[in-house]
Amino acid sequence: MERPIRFIAEAIYENRLKPFTFSAGTNLNWKYMDNQYLGDVVSENGIRSLGIYGFAQIKGSLGQFKEGTSRLTYVAGFGLSNQSYRQGDEEFSFWLCRPKLTLAYSLSSSFQIRLGSELSQHISQIAMISDTRIRKNSMEWTVGNPSLKPNSRYENWVVFSFSKPRINTDFTLNYRINRHCNLAKYTRTEDDQFLYTQANQPHCNMLYLTNDTRFDIIPDHLIFSVNAGIYRFFNKGDEYSHCYTAYNYGGTLQGYWGKWTVMLYADSGWNFMEGENIGHNPPSLATSASYHIGDFDFTLYMHNPFMAHPKSYSAEIVNALLRKQVRGYDNSGGNLLRIGVAWNINRGKEYRKIQRNINNEERETGILK
């Protein structure tokens, strides 16, 4: 039985001055949950949280090329946030100063360098701060930790961009630092039960170098896009230290001939490490062809052809007390063939409405997932 209440409000001010544009704003997010769970899981959660954030920034440009584009653009700002929380006897109030600076300098109309640095706030999933305890199997339990606190995330990046009429490429170097973040923690009891929970621990950092390239083989007819990256993960817990290197890549080939559109997509999946968990999302292969005639679009789509039982996920736990490998397979995801027909019946004049509503949907339940 769920009884969540949530209130969100925000206000933004902007003034376009001559040398730069000044903007400021504030955001308030209040939430109360008093949920009761019965059956296999017995839990009653009374959680109150309040988040307040305010910021001010300036945005401008200096110098111009003959084409009219700016040589140097900048954004400099400062924010202050507070996150307070209470559940039973547990409560905290977390303050964080949040500066931000981004610079973009164009060496020419084709080559640009972008630099950035930002300090932000990261809040652990609400599902992990309940006081619930769930049995996973005969030897494993998942346990909530109401004493989890938010943490700061410090991110620095540099992007090298090159652009020509037929080719666009970006090289991105990024270093993300998560200090005192929530990471996995395993405990072995005297009766050989393994308790999994999360706790604030030293850091979980990521350094990566990626490239995104688009090449128009035949302009407006045949386009090839590719992305590739090297990712290095650094995980430091209270009782462990793990590093992991992953290589992720993918590509898309798109063709346009008259009323025909053809697409071929392939990737290596996403590989990562967080805490003591190594995750592997499997490779994917897809192709589609569509034909447009009048008000109709006919589409043929294939996903993972020639694969009867493709792997949907795999994970590995590398804890000193617990070694575990998990794999999942999806019969419905292999040799998938889908035929689609779309009929456009729009007639008359169309007017676009201005969307002024804040779209927020409450999906948090306060229980472990």
Where are these regions (language model features)?
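Exposed, low-structure sequence patches enriched in small/polar residues
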Residues: 2-369
